[in-house]
């Protein structure tokens, strides 16, 4: 039987002004009840700059990930929702968001965790490292934490209903190299990924329904790896 103890702590400092800068720090300590331990750290830095008299916002967020050891349990989905390879200044969000009274439009780099199937408890919840989309992310290399990709996103709200839709490059990236960066658009190689969600909120409860379509098919090996 696999056991894992995780200690979580969060620090959310923020500086409020016309331009908003904030940071979120999450740490986990893992122990397999034998002799193996692991210490994971995730720092997210956010910057929002209002433009066009507040009708639009330049959004930027980076991820900084550090851990002391490799995965201590031989399960390719693992037990942590933040565990990933060490990385510095991976782009989570970088683009322009325009706001109307009941709608938003974003163009730039983004990932699915920013907008879809999010609630108070799914913002930080211990489950698979495939993120909040374990089935989709296990089948396709989408822009799911810790990866991002070029995106066109919009949402429309009316009453308690909200419809969201995003169109992404079919593969997510988190590097700073020529062939590994979230600004790549390669539909012939990576495919195109679209996800839609209908959300209903009532009396503090949220109900979700969604559909996702990918233009490519990927073979997943027994270790969970997908060929590039």
Where are these regions (language model features)?
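Residues that define the transmembrane beta-barrel architecture of outer-membrane proteins
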Residues: 31, 37-43, 87-92, 146-150, ...
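Outer-membrane beta-barrel domain signature
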Residues: 32-36, 82-85, 138-143, 183-187, ...
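Sequence/structural signature of outer-membrane beta-barrel proteins
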Residues: 28-32, 65-69, 114-116, 135-137, ...
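Short loop/turn motifs that connect adjacent beta-strands in outer-membrane beta-barrel proteins
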Residues: 16-21, 33-36, 48-59, 101-102, ...
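Long, well-ordered mid-to-C-terminal structural blocks that present hydrophobic/aromatic surfaces
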Residues: 200-228
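Sec-dependent N-terminal signal peptides
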Residues: 3-15
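Active-site substrate-binding loop specific to GH73 endo-beta-N-acetylglucosaminidase modules
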Residues: 129-137, 178-179, 189-192
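Outer membrane beta-barrel
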Residues: 49-170
């Amino acid at each position: 039987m696999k056991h894992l103890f995780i200690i979580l702590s969060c620090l959310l400092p923020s500086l409020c002004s016309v331009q908003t800068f904030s940071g979120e720090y999450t740490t986990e300590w893992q122990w397999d009840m034998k002799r193996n331990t692991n210490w994971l750290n995730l720092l997210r830095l956010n910057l929002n700059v209002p433009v066009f008299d507040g009708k639009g916002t330049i959004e930027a967020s980076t991820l900084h990930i550090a851990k002391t050891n490799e995965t201590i349990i031989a399960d390719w989905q693992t037990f942590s929702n933040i565990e990933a390879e060490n990385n510095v200044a991976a782009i989570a969000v970088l683009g322009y968001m325009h706001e109307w009274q009941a709608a938003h439009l974003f163009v730039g780099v983004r990932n699915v965790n920013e907008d879809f199937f999010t609630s108070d408890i799914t913002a930080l919840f211990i489950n698979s490292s495939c993120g909040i989309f374990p089935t989709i992310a296990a089948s396709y290399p989408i822009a799911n934490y810790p990866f991002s990709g070029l995106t066109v996103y919009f949402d429309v709200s009316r009453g308690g209903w909200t419809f969201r839709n995003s169109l992404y490059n079919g593969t997510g990236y988190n590097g700073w190299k020529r062939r590994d960066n979230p600004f790549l658009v390669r539909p012939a190689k990576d495919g195109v990924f679209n996800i839609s969600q209908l959300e209903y909120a009532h009396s503090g409860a949220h109900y979700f329904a969604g559909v996702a379509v990918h233009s490519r098919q990927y073979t997943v090996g027994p270790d969970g790896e997908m060929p590039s």
